[in-house]
Amino acid sequence: LDMQEIKSLTARAAKRWGEKIGLVFDEWNEQLSFQEIEDRSNQIANMLQVLGVRYGDRVAVMLRNQPEFPLTWLALAKLGATIVPINVNYKEYDAQYILHHSEAIVIVTSQEFLSLLQKIRPSLQTLKTILSIDQSDDPNVVDFRAMCETAPTTPTTLPVFPETLVNIQYTSGTTGLPKGCMLSHEYWLTIAKKVVEQHPHLTHSDVLLTAQPFYYMDPQWNLLGAIAVGAKLVVLDRFHPSTFWEKVRQYGVTFFYCLGIMPTLMVKAPRSPLDRENNVRTILCSAIPPHLHRELEERWGAPWYEVFGMTETGGDISVKPHDHDRLLGTGCIGKPDKDRTVRIVDVHNRPVSRGEVGELLLRGLGMMDGYFKDPDATCAAFQGGWFHTGDLVRMDEDGYIYYVGRKKEMIRRSGENISAAEVEEVMKMHPAVQYTACLPVQDELRGEEIKAYVVVKEGQVVPPHELIAYCTEHLAYYKIPRYWEYRSELPRTPSERIAKHVLANEKADLRIGSYDRIDDSWR
């Protein structure tokens, strides 16, 4: 892959695999050939030009996993314009902030979100046009599909460069306002090249599947990986644990990527005699629960490989096939990829010894260009020429890296540093527990105490004393949560991680509504 920008990639796919199906949208019962992907994205690009979109302009997209989302993304890349993906779960405040901060001049959306956008439109000085993929009676809304139908399918001739921005991808974040990661053509093509030339070595015979929203980055690199080799990408509306593997079987999927609590929810779903009746050859996953790793492989018959990456940096560290068997279930995230250099440092940015825990720093090709309109945050993130991930890891004597937890998610109780991830991992091993989240609670005596939010499996009842006894058996005494709260579900980020910042800000006193282990009472 010697492409310098995305439009060369789509043109190449149309020429090589024109009539082959490249995209399947399960929820919308629609499929597109590589030629149709090329033609329709060209139409959108030409239509947006008529509306005044130029090189460097920002265009927001607030859609579910519908064909118009990835097609608009490709169209903007061809124009040298920049997409601003908007989370469909955003309400007025979040949507207004991102549209205002990004200075988007156009937004592509659907009928579902028009009322929200009309409420905030008066405060958006730069927003000129609202395009809806559904027909609207509102004279201030432009019909996306009608305009596309009359637009030519000829490719745009505007020059686009490796450093041209494709996305301003706002991170869901856990603290503060979202930051816009500036992602270039080089960023995206570095990832596409990696999944083709390195493991998992995608080929034209692969069938990829994504169950994540297109406003998150993973479906986007899945799409480019598929276009690069002429593979098919199946797009689900979202992740449904009860039907996920049914869809994998239905479409003959050979590869997928997942992360967060997705593997835990998969393995907790009822078993089926058809579990191993699938074509999956390899699975990439971020944060595979070590205690479930072997069960995941034995149940579905495919290898699961740990990978580490961030919106800011792309793909960085992974377990390679020759290491898979030895590292199975160890929690190891592997070694740096070919285009990455790592450093592990203490709080003073001094390298730590092998085996010691420190913050992971990254350097290499194809990383973000910085945070949009935030030079201070960019300088802080790239201090000393290294990207500071905020993740705590350790490296063993052989150079293998083990994830410990987020720097900001370390709980300090009576002078002891406690990894929230470690406590959560132990609790998830309880047979009745679906998933958990641990947060710090301020305490005058100890500095911080641990609060555990617990979601139990359907039909299960587990009193606090049973979970406390389980933790006592498996954890050091100072790691046992003091406060316990049960929930039917927990809020999630777009990347299927627990949205701990939402939990932390729900109430002024996190002890309220919790069982107190020390006082043996509910607060």
Residue ranges and their predicted role:
Residues 90-96, 107-109, 256, 342, ...:
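AMP-binding/adenylate-forming catalytic core of the ANL superfamily
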Residues 19, 132, 149-170, 177, ...:
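Conserved pre-ATP/AMP-binding loop-to-beta segment of ANL
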Residues 31-35, 166-190:
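Conserved AMP-binding A3 loop
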Residues 114-162, 270:
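ANL superfamily adenylate-forming
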Residues 2, 19-66, 70-74, 91-96, ...:
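Conserved AMP-binding/adenylate-forming core of the ANL superfamily
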Residues 189-207, 215-254, 265, 269:
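Conserved AMP-binding/adenylation subdomain of ANL enzymes
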Residues 58, 64-84, 88-92, 100-106, ...:
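A short helix-loop-beta submotif of the ANL/AMP-binding
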Residues 228, 250-258, 267-327, 341, ...:
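Gly/Ser/Thr-rich phosphate-binding loop
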